[in-house]
Amino acid sequence: MKRIVLFLATNLAIVLVLSLTMRLLGVEPYLTANGLNLTSLLIFAAVMGFGGSLISLAISKWMAKKSMGVQVIETPANSTEFWLVETVRKYADDAGIGMPEVGIFPSPEVNAFATGMNKNNALVAVSAGLLSTMTRAEAEAVIGHEVAHVANGDMVTLALIQGVVNTFVMFLSRIIGHTVDRVVFKNEEGHGPAFFVTMIVAELVLGILASIIVMWFSRQREFRADRGGASLAGKGAMIAALERLRSLHPHPLPDKMAAFGIAGGGAAGLKRLFMTHPPLEERIAALRAVQ
C-alpha cells in the first residue's frame, strides 16, 4: 500500500510541476485556447497508462503459465518436486510473505522467474534445465532470489513505474501532436493527419526514452534481489549460482518475463541502457562487496 501511495504521490507531484511550468511559460493558456483541455487529457492518459500496466500485472500469473507452459505443483510427485516446494515454503516464511504457487516450465535453459499481483498471490517457477544442471545449493540461491523479488514487491513496483511513464508518454505525445498540427500546419478545426502522424512518432521516441528509465529501475531491483537471495540461501551460494549462470550463458526469457527472471542477456554500449538485468560480472562483484 505504501508503494502505491508513494508512486501516486510522485505522479501527482510531477503533474503539478509540469502544469505550473506550462502555466508560467504561457503554454497551458495557449493550448486551452486552441482546443486542448490539459486536465481531461491528463486524466485520459493516466487511465490508459496505469490501466494497461495494472491489467498486465493482474493477469501476469495466468499469462506466465500459458506462455511458459508452467506446470504448477499441486501435490509433489517426486523428491525433487517435494524439495522445490519445501524450499519455496521455507524462504517465503523467512521473508514474511504468503506461500507462492510453485511450478516447473519445460525448458533446457537454466532460468527461473517470479510473478504475481502481490506478495501473497505470487508464482515462483523454475526451468527443468535449472533443476538438472545446478547443484541444490545453487538452485536454492536462485529460488531465494525469486522469492526476494516477491518479498520486495518488484512486480508491483515496476508496474507502477511503467504506469507513470505510460501516462507521460501519452500526455506529452498528444501535446506535441496538437502543437505541430496547430502551429506548423495551421489546422484550426479538429485534428488533421499531422496530429496523428506526429503523435505516433512522438509516442515511439518518448516510449524508447521512457523504457530506459524502466530498465534502469529493473536493474536496481536485480541487485536488491541478489542481496535478498544471499540473505535467504547464503552469500556463497548466491555467488556460486551467478557464476554458474555466467559460465552457461543462459538464454533470456521472453520480453514480458525477462525483468523477473534470474538472468538477462549481455549487452554492450547503448544496448546496456535497455537491459533488464545488470551484467553477471557486476552482480557478482556487488555481492562480493556486501559485508
Curated annotation (Swiss-Prot):
Known EC number? 3.4.24.-
Q: Which cofactor does it need?
A: Zn(2+)
Binding positions for Zn(2+) per the UniProt entry: 145, 149, 222
The superkingdom of the source organism is Bacteria
One cellular component term from this protein's GO annotations in UniProt = plasma membrane
Keyword annotations of the record? Cell inner membrane, Cell membrane, Hydrolase, Membrane, Metal-binding, Metalloprotease, Protease, Transmembrane, Transmembrane helix, Zinc
- Supply the enzyme class, top level: hydrolase
InterPro entries to which the protein is assigned, alphabetical: HtpX_protease, Pept_M48_protease_HtpX, Peptidase_M48
| Pfam families xrefs | Peptidase_M48
Q: Which residues form the active site?
A: 146
Question: How does the protein's chain sit in the membrane according to the entry?
Answer: Multi-pass membrane protein
Instruction: Relay the cofactor remark from the entry.
Output: Binds 1 zinc ion per subunit.
Disulfide cross-links: none
Please list the GO terms describing molecular function. Answer: metalloendopeptidase activity; zinc ion binding
The subcellular location is: Cell inner membrane
Quote the HAMAP family the UniProt record gives: Pept_M48_protease_HtpX
Q: What protein am I looking at?
A: Protease HtpX homolog
